[in-house]
């Protein structure tokens, strides 16, 4: 590519934002309930792997359900660790990620069909676009306009006061993590659908970027979605700059690859302390 293509940028950015958007909404749901969730990466990755495996064996719809199911299983394990056994949220999140990395690596080596380009049956891209870009508005309406959303908000802000009002924080958090598993499952399924194959480690830190996006958005659905879209734009820009003979000449590709992540770190550093986390985040 010899020059910067604005039309191509606008075409590719939504697809690059989509997995982040789904994962960020999942992370926001659980963090709004008071659970620190650094396990988005692992839930996405296991969904990528299981979606690919089951799509090859049984077709794309079963693959999608399998990927969501695998992410939900890890989400429920996360719930048991944090709510039943009171394991530290950071430690349990890291444990979930390690389990997902190990399981996906094993399955990738055991079933080699899933990493061949074009072997994985795909659902229409429109399905994922509609699901992802409608979700922030739906989640905003849920949090602000429904009893369930207000309970979620209350538990995340003050679990003790929520108990006094007759709300069970443990039940709310289980349901929140269930939703997180579904959203991360969709995110992982999209990555595999978009790539047409499974590659070990293909989430490439997107779960952590999604976590950063929801923090940048102040734990609010619409601003968090905008942060995801901004990251998708940066990712699309760096891909074009890598291929540009004029702008990318002589500059290592690793530099361009790091730009979206560097921009995220700078944005987080600039907003550190300004965005208020849910007051009950990390509390039993």
Task: Go through the PLM ranges and name each one.
Residues 125-199, 221-226:
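Helix-loop-helix "hairpin" substructures at the membrane interface of multi-pass membrane proteins
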Residues 28-29, 53, 57, 73-76, ...:
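Membrane-interface helix caps of multi-pass small-molecule transporters
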Residues 32-36, 74-125, 147, 204-205, ...:
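Short loop segments and helix-boundary regions at transmembrane helix junctions
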Residues 23-24, 48-52, 101-105, 129-141, ...:
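Hydrophobic core segments of alpha-helical transmembrane domains in multi-pass membrane transport
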Residues 8-58, 64, 69, 73-90, ...:
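Single transmembrane alpha-helix segments in multi-pass membrane proteins
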Residues 198-261:
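Transmembrane alpha-helical segments in multi-pass inner-membrane proteins
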Residues 89, 93, 100-149, 198-200, ...:
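Transmembrane helix-bundle core of multi-pass membrane transporters
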Residues 138-143, 157-171, 241-284:
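Cytosolic-side transmembrane-helix boundaries in multi-pass membrane proteins
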């Amino acid at each position: 590519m010899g020059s910067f293509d604005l039309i191509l940028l606008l075409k590719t950015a939504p697809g690059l934002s989509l997995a982040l958007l789904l994962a960020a909404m999942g992370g926001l749901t659980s963090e709004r309930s008071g659970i620190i969730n650094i396990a988005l990466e692992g839930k996405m990755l296991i969904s990528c792997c299981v979606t690919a495996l089951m799509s090859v064996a049984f077709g794309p719809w079963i693959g999608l359900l399998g990927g969501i199911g695998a992410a939900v299983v890890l989400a429920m394990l996360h719930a048991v660790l944090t709510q039943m056994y009171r394991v530290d949220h950071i430690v349990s999140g890291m444990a979930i990620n390690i389990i997902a990395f190990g399981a996906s690596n094993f399955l990738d080596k055991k079933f080699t069909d899933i990493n061949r380009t074009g072997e994985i049956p795909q659902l229409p891209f429109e399905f994922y676009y509609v699901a992802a870009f409608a979700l922030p508005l739906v989640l905003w309406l849920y949090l602000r306009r429904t009893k369930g959303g207000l309970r979620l908000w209350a538990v995340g802000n003050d679990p003790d006061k929520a108990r006094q009002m007759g709300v069970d924080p443990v039940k709310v958090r289980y349901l929140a993590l269930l939703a997180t598993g579904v959203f991360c499952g969709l995110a992982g399924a999209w990555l595999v659908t978009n790539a047409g194959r499974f590659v070990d480690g293909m989430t490439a830190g997107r779960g952590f970027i999604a976590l950063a996006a929801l923090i940048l958005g102040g734990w609010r659905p619409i601003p968090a979605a905008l942060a995801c879209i901004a990251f998708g734009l940066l990712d699309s820009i760096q891909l074009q700059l890598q291929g540009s003979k004029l702008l990318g000449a002589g500059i290592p590709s690793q530099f361009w690859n790091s730009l979206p992540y560097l921009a995220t770190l700078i944005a987080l550093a600039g907003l550190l302390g300004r965005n208020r986390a849910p007051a009950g985040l990390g509390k039993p």
